[in-house]
């Protein structure tokens, strides 16, 4: 089994340099770090993270707080975070808040009181701004990922959900649809509220009426989408198009309408949000709003470890954009946003 001296010899550096890469990577140039990491991978060398953690008063673990561990987009985010953490020799503790703010607070309380982790990544946190500012005083590195917050000096990677909702409605409007419905997440998650705000903004700019009877809350699931579609069809005048706030529900809407002899998109157009894999496997293929979930995870983890490894670290904000993916479920159109 390889040891640190073997790695130093293969990389052409001193043992002290290898030790700095492992324990204080911020003090070593990126080129040197990458070379050492590559040699470590080639030699299958794994540092003794427990011993290092004891020496440095570190746990060599981070926590990831997710609103829903079954959500495909959150799984992609987790994959990006875990990939970076693994390269750094860190474990990732997964905490599922189930879109419950109190449960999220309980997790944070346990993590902070016991100093069980060296940092935390919070995806679409339900905490209020004042609570996040209070968290800063705990001297525990953390990163906010997902929806935009009006906070200063916070490590964050944001997704513009409002723009995503705006893109969705704008695309449907550009295809000539006037009566447009919206199926939202029943949990009233803040990111879904932002999507709805963008949706309403696009309708207002085009002087289109917002039909309350076409606005339906549903569970973020196949069952939720099915029930919402059923309710939509009970209306005397069905909407011409529907924007669904998540792809699983959108796919369920598509299936239900098809089974009730509604032709997509000729009778009703459907547009989702997330761009999960199944959107390309149904017929017609689902148009959707995509966001770089995996990249969000990667960048969030990098920000967190930069903070953990550097005492003089200054917080950063990174903004990622949504993208309209045009397929067949809305009809033919060449407009992209």
Question: Which stretches of residues belong to each language-model region?
Answer:
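Active-site-adjacent beta->alpha loops and helix N-cap segments on the catalytic face
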Residues: 127-136
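N-terminal helix-turn-helix DNA-binding module of bacterial transcription factors
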Residues: 1-60, 73
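Short beta-strand segments enriched in small/hydrophobic residues
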Residues: 17-20, 54-70, 171, 179-186
């Amino acid at each position: 089994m390889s040891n640190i001296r073997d790695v130093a010899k293969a990389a052409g550096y001193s043992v002290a340099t290898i030790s700095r890469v492992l324990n204080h990577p911020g003090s070593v140039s990126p080129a040197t770090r990458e070379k050492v990491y590559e040699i470590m991978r080639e030699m299958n060398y794994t540092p003794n993270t427990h011993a290092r953690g004891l020496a440095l008063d570190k746990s060599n673990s981070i926590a990831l707080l997710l609103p829903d561990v079954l959500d495909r987009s959150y799984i992609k985010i987790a994959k990006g975070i875990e990939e970076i953490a693994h390269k750094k020799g860190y474990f990732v503790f997964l905490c599922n808040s189930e879109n419950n703010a109190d449960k999220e607070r309980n997790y944070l309380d346990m993590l902070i009181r016991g100093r069980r982790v060296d940092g935390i990544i919070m995806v679409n946190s339900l905490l209020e701004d004042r609570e996040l500012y209070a968290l800063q005083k705990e001297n525990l590195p953390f990163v906010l990922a997902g929806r935009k917050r009006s906070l200063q000096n916070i490590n964050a990677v944001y997704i513009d959900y409002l723009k995503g909702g705006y893109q969705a409605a704008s695309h449907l409007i550009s295809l000539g649809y006037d009566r447009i419905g919206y199926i939202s997440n029943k949990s009233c998650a803040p990111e879904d509220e932002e999507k709805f705000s963008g949706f309403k903004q696009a309708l207002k700019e085009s002087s289109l009426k917002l039909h309350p009877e076409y606005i339906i809350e549903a569970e973020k699931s196949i069952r939720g989408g099915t029930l919402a579609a059923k309710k939509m069809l009970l209306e005397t005048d069905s909407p011409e198009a529907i924007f669904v706030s998540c792809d699983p529900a959108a796919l369920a809407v598509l299936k239900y309408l098809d089974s009730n002899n509604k032709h997509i998109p000729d009778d009703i157009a459907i547009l989702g949000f997330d761009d999960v894999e199944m959107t390309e496997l149904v017929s017609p293929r689902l148009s959707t709003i995509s966001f770089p979930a995996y990249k969000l995870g990667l960048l969030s983890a990098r920000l967190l470890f930069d903070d953990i490894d550097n005492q003089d670290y200054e917080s950063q904000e990174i903004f990622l954009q949504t993208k309209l993916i045009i397929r067949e479920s809305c009809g033919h159109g060449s407009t992209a946003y």
